[in-house]
Amino acid sequence: MVTIGVDEAGRGPLAGPVVAAAVVLCKPRPSGLDDSKKLSAARRAELEEKIKRRCRWAVGVVEPDEIDRLNIFGATMLAMTLAVGALCEQLAHDEDVGEVLVDGNLTPHGRRPEWCWPARPIVGGDALEPCISAASIIAKEHRDRLMREAALAHPHYGWERNAGYGTPEHLAALREHGPTPLHRRSFAPVAQLQLL
């Protein structure tokens, strides 16, 4: 039986996808795992490389148009479901999922029809459970990379620095240049601009 850790990155930004990662830790597990928000960028990148090289992992990505259609909660549950489903495809036929540990107070169980694994929510799990810590690192690094790439096509918004969050720089660019296809139109600052 394997335990899978799941976490997401990108629920709060005004632009870009929400990304979930699912990780089955290797033995011995990489040392220094912690909540991705507590790690320096250099340490996160180092741990991401170790996790990707030595552990089994997958990501689920839900784009802004789907976030607008489902709402951010539904999109997060979908991203988690996609990540766990993709990871389970990597497992050997004789490996069963014992439990999926999800950062937060809710899981996709009963909220996504495709979710078929036993799940347990853990508030603050990204700092408490190493497999969730690993997932938080993979999710954040993956999403940050996507936003750096998106910044090349949309340079006015500073996404390589703010990852799509509503910083003063991003809000000023949004007012001046308007929303891009990567903006979440259901999020208040973007929706309010569309009403003007």
UniProtKB/Swiss-Prot annotation:
Alphabetized Pfam families for the sequence: RNase_HII (PF01351)
CDD domains assigned: RNase_HII_bacteria_HII_like
Keyword Cytoplasm: yes
The organism's place on the tree of life at top rank: Bacteria
One of the record's GO molecular function terms: RNA-DNA hybrid ribonuclease activity
Keywords: Cytoplasm, Endonuclease, Hydrolase, Manganese, Metal-binding, Nuclease
Primary site of residence: cytoplasm
RNase H type-2 domain residues: 1-196
Function: Endonuclease that specifically degrades the RNA of RNA-DNA hybrids.
Name of the protein described by the UniProt record: Ribonuclease HII
Gene: rnhB
